[in-house]
Amino acid sequence: MPTINQLVRKPRKSKIEKSDSPALNIGYNSHKKVHTKIAAPQKRGVATRVGTMTPKKPNSALRKFARVRLSNLIEVTAYIPGIGHNLQEHSVVLIRGGRVKDLPGVRYHIVRGALDTAGVADRKQGRSKYGAKRPKG
């Protein structure tokens, strides 16, 4: 426990909060070619690679992912949620924050039903999370 005198000489430092999705907190000024500090809830990007990845131990699957070059020129790995997708190289996608616990290095999710990404077909429940329209009838 520090004394009052020690605290007067050297005050306590406040804890620095680290972002879970740092690429969303950076903007880009293409006119000046400089990165700016502008936070955004989502960002647009272009898929540079689409593939599958295997999760960490105890799980076993082929998880779909896309490598995305964002509008701020940062390249990130994003998870493609839902069953089946229509993404390929050069597809324009919208990403949001949110990691995938069993895929190391995947800190972002692709938003289904936005831009070039189609919603999940034949989805009856939890449709809003997968960009699925309300079924007729």
Swiss-Prot record:
Keywords, in A-Z order: Methylation, Ribonucleoprotein, Ribosomal protein, RNA-binding, rRNA-binding, tRNA-binding
Domain of life: Bacteria
PROSITE patterns for the chain: RIBOSOMAL_S12
Region (Disordered): 1-21, 34-57
Similarity-based family: Belongs to the universal ribosomal protein uS12 family.
NCBIfam families per the UniProt record, alphabetical: rpsL_bact
Any single biological process term in GO: translation
Residues that bear 3-methylthioaspartic acid: 102
SUBUNIT field: Part of the 30S ribosomal subunit. Contacts proteins S8 and S17. May interact with IF1 in the 30S initiation complex.
One Pfam family linked to the record: Ribosom_S12_S23
Molecular function GO terms recorded: rRNA binding; structural constituent of ribosome; tRNA binding
Coiled-coil regions listed in the entry: none
Function: With S4 and S5 plays an important role in translational accuracy.
Name under which the protein is recorded: Small ribosomal subunit protein uS12
Gene: rpsL
GO cellular component, one term: small ribosomal subunit
Keyword Ribonucleoprotein: yes
